[in-house]
């Protein structure tokens, strides 16, 4: 999985006054969990643009100076309800020998036979939770829709790779090809046309 580097500074004070001062200065207060103790730090709000405002998934390298560096993933984010300004971010520390669960986007590949026949593709799951060692986290889960005929569904059991485990029930639908109104109407008209000669035929 691709990684984004966030350069920040450890916080000496974590009270409300210092937190408000940080935000007024254009910084975001953050906490890194998962290690022996929580690490409080802050970073410029602009540093999070490529991490937060994107449909893609990333791991994060947090650099706090003096040789302190941590690998992590974004765990939780708080934004202002009106301005969408980032108020606070929680991160979770990664360790090479410990599996982690996170959401990654679904990438559709291939051309469905059902779509070519007039069906409509519906993506039921835009993201899937996967569990893997940090080195095996995928940038996305590839979903090949090529075999899907009209009315078929693609389940999570048909996507993914051995390097990671998909954390959803086997009956979870990733994508499906629905019969479009146009295709349904055409089928109905074809059925009527097929019956017409039979009705008009005299014995």
Swiss-Prot record:
Transmembrane segments: none annotated. Gene3D superfamilies: Ribosomal protein L25, beta domain, Ribosomal Protein L25, Chain P. GO terms for molecular function: 5S rRNA binding; structural constituent of ribosome. One of its GO terms (cellular component) is cytosolic large ribosomal subunit. Coiled coil: none annotated. CDD domains: Ribosomal_L25_TL5_CTC. Keywords: Ribonucleoprotein, Ribosomal protein, RNA-binding, rRNA-binding. Part of the 50S ribosomal subunit; part of the 5S rRNA/L5/L18/L25 subcomplex. Contacts the 5S rRNA. Binds to the 5S rRNA independently of L5 and L18. This is one of the proteins that binds to the 5S RNA in the ribosome where it forms part of the central protuberance. This is Large ribosomal subunit protein bL25. It comes from Flavobacterium johnsoniae (strain ATCC 17061 / DSM 2064 / JCM 8514 / BCRC 14874 / CCUG 350202 / NBRC 14942 / NCIMB 11054 / UW101).
